[in-house]
Amino acid sequence: MYTRNIGLDVKLPESECNDPHCPYHGKLSVRGQVLTGKVVSANMTKSAVVAREYQQYIPKYERKATKIKKYHVHVPDCIKIKPGDTVRFAECRKLAKTISFVIVEKVNQ
């Protein structure tokens, strides 16, 4: 099967899939933000929860606080993930009520 170039500098998946919401083997286009995070939960069907940690400066206390933002992401069949993996995910059109990101690369092996 043909693997599309999605326009990002990421490693292509080795396996193939028939998922229509796959950016490589389906018709889903990615645009907008490209983020990196850690998989917290992969219990949903073809979906996962990815968390990103960032530091926010609080002027009143003159300190930085660590915040966590969770994203619901679509997992194509050609990318295998498990909780604890670091992944790169990109913004796409809305696929469900809370899912508007898709995993494009597994960063660590």
UniProtKB/Swiss-Prot annotation:
UniProt key word RNA-binding: yes
Gene3D superfamilies linked: 2.40.50.1000
Ranges annotated as spanning the membrane: none
GO molecular function, one term: structural constituent of ribosome
Keyword terms of this UniProt record: Ribonucleoprotein, Ribosomal protein, RNA-binding, rRNA-binding
BP term (GO), one: translation
GO cellular component: cytosolic small ribosomal subunit
InterPro entries associated with the record: NA-bd_OB-fold, Ribosomal_uS17, Ribosomal_uS17_arc/euk, Ribosomal_uS17_archaeal
Similarity comment: family membership: Belongs to the universal ribosomal protein uS17 family.
Subunit structure: Part of the 30S ribosomal subunit.
Known role: One of the primary rRNA binding proteins, it binds specifically to the 5'-end of 16S ribosomal RNA.
Protein name in the entry: Small ribosomal subunit protein uS17
Protein's organism: Thermoplasma acidophilum (strain ATCC 25905 / DSM 1728 / JCM 9062 / NBRC 15155 / AMRC-C165)
